[in-house]
């Protein structure tokens, strides 16, 4: 069922009111990014806000690596020509971030924005690539950005692009990005889409949308604007001599469809005379350059053609304004393409496919004469008619001036209005926990290993007021009964109990400690981990209650050390942020978190505890996978509260094959029942597996329909 979402609310701005400071955090922006839809949309918005007197900063999330030109020159251009700050995102080399590209950039973005959070009232992120993920999590969790409003714009998620491009999942990073995009949208203060179409697509594909979700068209670039008096628009251009494919040279934008239509037109030797231009950015198509693809297809054409791939938005529109040119936007799937918006704004004659949000751009009275069903025969006939009888320009469905004013005024009232609304958070069951619930620290360690003293010392300094500590001594030769004391070993007022076990398996030790625990929450910690902040457990509890998490993990800093060395000589060399409850990515890598986590007792019992098997260095991954597949809420904090020591004098078993295989067991358990959300995640796992096979087959030349087969076994 199709829903209708409201437009941006109309805001009246009081004269003399302080305008909020705006940051647009994006990996595409005009200049550093050429011919980029997201970049054009954000550039137009930034220009409109600047004209209205706003302080606007662009945080360029690709750092000092623009796809075009030199970053120093672009910074100077934005300062002198636009009066804006263009800041390339700093990405420190140390500590090294253990993460895929999108996660790493998102984490660097969070670190920078947290440091500058008081410089901005409003921060924009695109949903595509999910680069606002950690910043948005931190606000939801109450860790940062209390006075900042996050606006996420819906441009086109990764899997929506995959669907429209008829492409498969090519790498694990794309699974991560899908989860980051979905989470960023769900936790945003505001979600704004230029079209009703994309919001409905999201709902139909299992996305959770925030309560404050709106539709607002893009601001039209000034370079593409005409006066809005219809008399200034071309009635009909009766001398169409050049057909211009306008858009990125890719399948989703209709390149193959357009070439198929040209085949039909050129097959008719008595057909009209014309030439063809491809006006758009080169891409990869079927594993090769799209320019090479066009060159091969042109062998069937009897008309001259050429490619123009080096124009920015303004010069591209100027080219289309030339006499005798017809723009063709033949997209198979599209949201609210700037190509159509700019042609409508500039009065350029056009034909556009009737897919996605394209009809929402065009006035209802003009849609029939401009829009077409994306089929080669239909497009060929529409081009033939345009050459024979001329082609009209189209009117916009909404006033461009009204759209810009609405965006500008909405920002003016946004930050003050947002502070009057309570934070968006998941409702929790208040009856099942107190303000300061009892937390049971479950510390299982092998008595034959040295280095537990530093972990114990970090536990002693914790300021959480309602804490008990269970020490599970694994591998003990003297399994004496459990003992308890209220002030054991300098633990202040914390109750401490010890249990001894002959078995050395840490998973079994953690389970034994959990059975002894009395707390509403269980906090697991191992002997290589330190809680350096005295409020670490307090923060874990506060965040878990705020977001109603069943399991809460955090980023981990790794430092070099030795079992015999001083814990004071710490040198952080790397850091690992996690994703939380991403069941799809979790089938291939532990993206959930580490063993050192806060777990609600009833969630622990639902999962059934850790593995009791002898080699259990990856029992955290298996445990967290089970929890994710049971739809328990796993949340991760981007802030570092855990420091993990990597011993220089001990080999690690973390990457052992046996342990890695065990982590897949939750995904292959027969007869398990999962929620619709988990079914969707598992479908992504299947798509990724299929993509890996197709990629391998393409690289090795193996037919796509056949795998490797050995000789038949006959006896």
Segments from the language model and where they lie:
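Nucleotide-activated donor-binding/catalytic signature segment of Leloir-type glycosyltransferases, i.e.
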Residues: 280, 290-319, 488-497
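Aromatic "clamp/platform" in nucleotide-sugar-dependent glycosyltransferases that forms part
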Residues: 332, 502
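Conserved acidic donor-binding segment of nucleotide-sugar-dependent glycosyltransferases
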Residues: 368-377, 385-390, 501
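Short, acidic, metal-binding catalytic loop of nucleotide-sugar glycosyltransferases
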Residues: 457-466
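A recurrent flexible, glycine/aromatic-enriched loop bordering the glycosyltransferase active site
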Residues: 507, 579-599
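Short aromatic/hydrophobic "clamp" motif used to bind/position activated sugar donors
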Residues: 522
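Conserved donor NDP-sugar-binding/catalytic core segment of glycosyltransferases
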Residues: 535-568
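Acidic donor-binding loop at a coil-to-helix junction in glycosyltransferase catalytic cores
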Residues: 616-623
């Amino acid at each position: 069922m199709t829903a209708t979402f409201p437009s941006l609310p109309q805001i009246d701005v009081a004269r003399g009111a302080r305008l909020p400071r705006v940051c647009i955090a994006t990996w595409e922006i005009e200049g550093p990014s050429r011919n980029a839809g997201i970049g054009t949309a954000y550039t137009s918005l930034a220009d409109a806000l600047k004209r209205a007197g706003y302080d606007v900063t662009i945080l360029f999330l690709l750092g000092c690596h623009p796809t075009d030109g030199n970053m120093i020159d672009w910074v100077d251009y934005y300062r002198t020509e636009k009066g804006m700050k263009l800041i390339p995102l700093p990405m420190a080399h140390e500590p090294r971030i253990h993460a895929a590209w999108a996660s790493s950039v998102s984490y660097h973005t969070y670190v920078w924005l947290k440091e500058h959070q008081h410089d901005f009232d409003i921060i924009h992120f695109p949903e595509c690539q999910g680069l606002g993920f950690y910043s948005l999590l931190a606000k939801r969790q109450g860790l940062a950005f209390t006075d900042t409003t996050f606006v996420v714009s819906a441009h086109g998620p990764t899997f929506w692009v995959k669907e429209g491009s008829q492409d498969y999942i090519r790498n694990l990073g794309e699974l991560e990005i899908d989860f980051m995009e979905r989470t960023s949208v769900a936790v945003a203060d505001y979600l704004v889409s230029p079209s009703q179409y994309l919001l409905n697509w999201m709902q139909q594909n299992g996305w959770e949308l925030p309560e404050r979700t709106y539709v607002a068209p893009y601001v039209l670039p000034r370079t593409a604007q005409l006066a809005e008096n219809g008399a200034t628009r071309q009635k009909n251009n009766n001398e169409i001599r050049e057909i211009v494919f306008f858009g990125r040279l890719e399948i989703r934008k209709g390149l193959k469809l357009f070439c198929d239509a040209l085949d039909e037109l050129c097959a008719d030797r008595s057909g009209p005379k014309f030439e063809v231009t491809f006006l758009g950015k080169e891409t990869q198509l079927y594993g090769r350059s799209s320019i090479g693809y066009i060159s091969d297809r042109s062998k069937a054409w009897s008309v001259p053609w050429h490619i123009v791939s080096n124009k920015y938005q303004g010069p591209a529109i100027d080219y289309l304004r030339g006499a005798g040119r017809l723009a063709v936007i033949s997209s198979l799937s599209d949201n609210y393409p700037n190509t159509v918006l700019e042609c409508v704004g500039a009065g350029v004659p056009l034909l556009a496919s009737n897919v996605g949000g394209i009809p929402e751009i065009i006035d209802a009275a003009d849609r029939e004469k401009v829009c077409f069903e994306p089929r080669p025969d239909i497009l060929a006939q529409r081009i033939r008619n345009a050459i024979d009888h001329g082609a009209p320009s189209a009117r916009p469905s909404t006033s461009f001036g009204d759209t810009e004013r609405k965006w500008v005024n909405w920002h003016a009232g946004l930050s003050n209005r947002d502070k009057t609304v309570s934070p968006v958070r998941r409702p929790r069951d208040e009856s099942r926990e107190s303000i300061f619930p009892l937390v049971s620290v479950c510390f299982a360690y092998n008595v034959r290993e040295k280095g537990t003293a530093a972990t114990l010392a970090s536990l002693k300094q914790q300021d959480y007021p309602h804490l008990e500590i269970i020490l599970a001594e694994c591998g003990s030769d003297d399994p004496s009964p459990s003992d308890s004391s209220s002030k054991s070993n300098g633990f202040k007022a914390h109750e401490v109990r010890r249990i001894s076990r002959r078995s050395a398996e840490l998973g079994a030790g953690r389970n034994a400690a959990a059975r002894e625990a009395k707390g509403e929450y269980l906090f697991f910690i191992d002997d290589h981990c330190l809680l350096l902040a005295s409020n670490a457990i307090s923060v874990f509890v506060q965040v878990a209650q705020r977001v109603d998490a069943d399991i809460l993990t955090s980023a981990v800093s790794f430092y070099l050390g030795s079992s015999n060395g001083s814990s004071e000589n710490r040198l952080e060399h790397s850091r690992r942020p996690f994703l939380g409850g991403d069941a799809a990515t979790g089938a291939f890598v532990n993206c959930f978190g580490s063993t050192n986590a806060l777990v609600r007792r009833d969630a622990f019992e639902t999962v059934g505890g850790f593995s009791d098997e002898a080699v259990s260095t990856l029992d955290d991954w298996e445990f967290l996978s089970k929890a994710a597949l049971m739809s328990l809420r796993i949340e991760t904090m981007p802030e570092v509260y855990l420091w993990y020591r990597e011993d220089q004098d001990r080999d690690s078993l973390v990457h052992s094959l046996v342990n890695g295989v065990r982590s897949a067991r939750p995904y292959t358990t027969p007869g398990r029942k999962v929620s619709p959300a988990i079914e969707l995640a598992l479908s992504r796992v299947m798509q990724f597996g299929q993509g890996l096979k197709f990629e391998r087959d393409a690289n090795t030349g193996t037919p796509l329909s056949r795998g490797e087969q050995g000789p038949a076994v006959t006896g």
